[in-house]
Amino acid sequence: MVYESGNKPGPENPTFSSDLSLSDSLVKLKKKPCEVCGSDANELLMMTCFMCRDTREHTYCARVMFQRVPRLWICEECRDFSSVANKTANAQSSRTIQVEQVVVKQVRIDQTVPSPRTNQVVDNHQDPPIDQTDPSSTTIQVVDNENLIEAAPSSRSNQVVDNKDWIEAAPSLRSNQVVPVAPRIHEFTTDESSSPVSPCSLDDETNLFHFKYPSLSLPPLMKN
């Protein structure tokens, strides 16, 4: 057999050596044992991790048993790492969503609550307040007060008139209750004389009772 280059493939040829090293690396990669059982047998049932390309397991040695080698298989270490990364990403996304919701609420509040400056501008369109120091406004106020005083009668005077009418119309209750009482004179007899003696008499001018006793006789209550 004649070669065009004129050199036979051998250890001295660099092309041959590179091809040999590549084939050796492929053999070593294929010969890596199973991570579970440690055997490199049954190469057709050996699964290689799609992410790390380092972990190898048999279909019957994996935690979940497979009937055949799947197209994409991920080892447990890569799966745990991806789950942690997903949790971190989900937490960050949820936090971002919460911050966005807070910002949206603040924007809505700012839009719904009117500005006090705006209210002040709207209120300025109303009639200006009356200046108390202005003489024209003071004169108008005095005239209005006088008109009110002249137009409206005094409620106090009306009340006095009503009270007088009531006093004249209604008789006095105290005068109706006074009943004339006739004075009574009690007569007492003494041992000295059998004639009746009036020890007390009613004075018409002062309406007081005066007790009158004989000079030698004692009052009835003080006799022994």
Curated annotation (Swiss-Prot):
Biological role stated in the UniProt entry: Together with AIPP3/BDT1, cooperates to form a BAH-PHD bivalent histone reader complex able to read histone H3 lysine 27 trimethylation (H3K27me3) histone marks in order to regulate transcription, especially to prevent early flowering; promotes AIPP3/BDT1 binding to H3K27me3.
Complex formation: Interacts directly with AIPP3/BDT1.
Null allele phenotype: No obvious developmental defects. Plants missing all PHD finger-containing proteins (e.g. PHD1, PAIPP2/PHD2, AIPP2/PHD3, PHD4, PHD5 and PHD6) exhibit an increased expression of flowering genes leading to an early flowering phenotype under long-day conditions as well as growth retardation.
Bilayer-spanning residue ranges: none
Binding-site list for Zn(2+) 1: C34, C37, H58, C61
Chain spans, region Disordered: 116-137
Gene3D superfamilies attached to this UniProt entry: Zinc/RING finger domain, C3HC4 (zinc finger)
Gene (UniProt): PHD5
Protein name: PHD finger-containing protein 5
Zinc fingers classed as PHD-type: ranges: 31-81
